[in-house]
From Swiss-Prot:
<feature type="region of interest" description="G2">
    <location>
        <begin position="38"/>
        <end position="42"/>
    </location>
</feature>
<dbReference type="Pfam" id="PF01926">
    <property type="entry name" value="MMR_HSR1"/>
</dbReference>
<dbReference type="GO" id="GO:0043024">
    <property type="term" value="F:ribosomal small subunit binding"/>
</dbReference>
<dbReference type="InterPro" id="IPR030388">
    <property type="entry name" value="G_ERA_dom"/>
</dbReference>
<feature type="region of interest" description="G5">
    <location>
        <begin position="152"/>
        <end position="154"/>
    </location>
</feature>
<dbReference type="GO" id="GO:0000028">
    <property type="term" value="P:ribosomal small subunit assembly"/>
</dbReference>
<feature type="domain" description="KH type-2">
    <location>
        <begin position="204"/>
        <end position="282"/>
    </location>
</feature>
<comment type="function">
    <text>An essential GTPase that binds both GDP and GTP, with rapid nucleotide exchange. Plays a role in 16S rRNA processing and 30S ribosomal subunit biogenesis and possibly also in cell cycle regulation and energy metabolism.</text>
</comment>
<dbReference type="InterPro" id="IPR015946">
    <property type="entry name" value="KH_dom-like_a/b"/>
</dbReference>
<keyword id="KW-1003">Cell membrane</keyword>
<feature type="region of interest" description="G1">
    <location>
        <begin position="12"/>
        <end position="19"/>
    </location>
</feature>
<feature type="binding site">
    <location>
        <begin position="122"/>
        <end position="125"/>
    </location>
    <ligand>
        <name>GTP</name>
    </ligand>
</feature>
<dbReference type="GO" id="GO:0005886">
    <property type="term" value="C:plasma membrane"/>
</dbReference>
<dbReference type="InterPro" id="IPR005662">
    <property type="entry name" value="GTPase_Era-like"/>
</dbReference>
<keyword id="KW-0472">Membrane</keyword>
<dbReference type="InterPro" id="IPR006073">
    <property type="entry name" value="GTP-bd"/>
</dbReference>
<dbReference type="InterPro" id="IPR009019">
    <property type="entry name" value="KH_sf_prok-type"/>
</dbReference>
Amino acid sequence: MIKKYGIVAIVGKPNVGKSTLINAIMKKKVSIISNKPQTTRNAVKEIYEDDESAIIFTDTPGFHEPSNKLDLFLNHEIEISYKEANVILFVTTMDKELDANDFEIINLIKEANKENIILVISKAEMAKNQDQIDERIHFLKKHIAFKDVVQISALHVINIDKLINTIKNYLHKDVVTDYFRQKAEKEDKFVITEIIREQCLLNLNHEVPHGVGVEIDESKYNQEANHWIIKASIIIEKNSHKPIIIGQNGTMIKKISMGARKQLHEIYDCHISLTIFVKVENNWRDNNNIIKSLGYKIKK
């Protein structure tokens, strides 16, 4: 079937609403949302499809200075997203001032030499007035050429359809095959690990910030009973982090498990049995083998 087709990279500094935006577009939870930076690790790819178009949306990790091999992976994911994209959505949010991180992203867009750039004003409802938004747009236009500007509120699902229709103006017509759909489809394993990791980020505050990985040990689905049994492990870097994650009398690990189980039930509409263990892998973020085993690709 011939449709308007393209790859769209959603870029911007951490916590400007990229994950909320892609979730609003897809109308389901595919990218973890937290008020802490670096909550999106993999470049999340999801396919949006309607009668006239098929679009792969890529929600990129936030760019940051690398301090270990995992950080290098994260920045490599961003580079790939920019190169593959037919359209780039540069997201800026009205509840935060522009800073050096925004201009780092702008420089990356310029280096990628992309023409189809759409400025997305996120959390437009947080602006004092329209003049404040217009001032932001005018300032950014001095630094990079945007083809279009769309004001949205992803959380309240305002102007999401307008954004999708704007994107369609810059797509090309192509044959959309089953291979295309399979390539874009997210694996259940990724969704499970991201949701568990989100619960860690939400509940642990800054005690065990980002030295947390998640591994699926077992996944069995009983179709007749509509029952999914999942066993997973939270990977940490230090023994001293273990009692923090487990909590007194297991209260924290129980809280993480219950939060993840509730979200998985809402997404998959089945009974979820989730058991979470804690494993210590010293300095795992600098261990290529462990990074690969957790589903991350290493830049060669």
